[in-house]
Amino acid sequence: MTLLQRIELERGKREPGEITELNLDNSKSVDIEGLTDEYSSLEVLSMMNVGLQSLAGLPCLAGLKTLELSNNLISGGLDALLKCPNIEQLNLSSNKIESMDVLIPLAKLSELKSLDLGNCPVTSTENYRKKAFAMIPSLKYLDGLDENNEEEVFGNDFLNGGLDEEADGVGIEALQQSGELEDDEDDYAPGEDEEAELDDYDDVDDEDEDDVEEDNGANLSAANVSGPRRPGTKRRHEDIQDGKNGGNAEHCGTKHKHTEDHVETHVENGSTADD
């Protein structure tokens, strides 16, 4: 797909002035064609791996902030970038730029903060980084590193004015001091349906506990295990025993009478044996 065809595809039914971002990566053209100054709202333009050899067809794009031109065949003519005076981030990595002199026009881009020339022959120049920072006063990051070889930490947020929480004053500490963060338990108030459901759960739990206590008491009694028990369990166990004793009183009296008769019979039999 040619660059012109890709532009038409990305545009669709929109007016050029409505488009703020345009991705034309991997389309094919040696020159920039199809772009006009009608794209006045364009802020991000990407033309990676297109095969560009020249930037001469680049239109005036005053609002453009990010321009991606990596993996092309550009070796010079960077003065065309002055048509976009507000560029902040420029990626020219993996191109054919060999000389530091080719970079001189970039010194006039007063908003340029991040420049990437990785995999370009120019990076082999002695003191390349030092010379580049000296040449472009506004430059903060070169190939992802600052002058002290520290990595670029803010990325696009830095280019957009910084979005860190300290700058905005909306960090965790600020929220805590303002009272915005409170304990969830203080805010939560269950509705009537939820309270009824919770009460049902409590009743079920109480019944389950009573059943467990009765079972434990019965098991301990059957095993003749003595020891401290929970008061509720002991009372229930004594009530059960009293009920059993009351219900079996008549049987106990019968058993006692039977025992006395058995003793008397035994005595009589003993006497007979002695006689």
Curated annotation (Swiss-Prot):
Domain of life where this protein originates: Eukaryota
Positions in coiled-coil regions: none
Biased composition (Acidic residues): 180-216
Family classification: Belongs to the ANP32 family.
Species, as recorded: Schistosoma mansoni (Blood fluke)
LRR repeat windows: 18-39, 41-62, 63-85, 86-107
Keywords noted in UniProt: Leucine-rich repeat, Repeat
Domain LRRCT residue range list: 120-158
GO cellular component terms, A-Z: nucleus
Name under which the protein is recorded: Acidic leucine-rich nuclear phosphoprotein 32-related protein
GO molecular-function terms, A-Z: histone binding
Residue ranges, annotated region (Disordered): 176-275
PROSITE patterns in UniProt: LRR (PS51450)
Compositional bias of kind Basic and acidic residues: 258-267
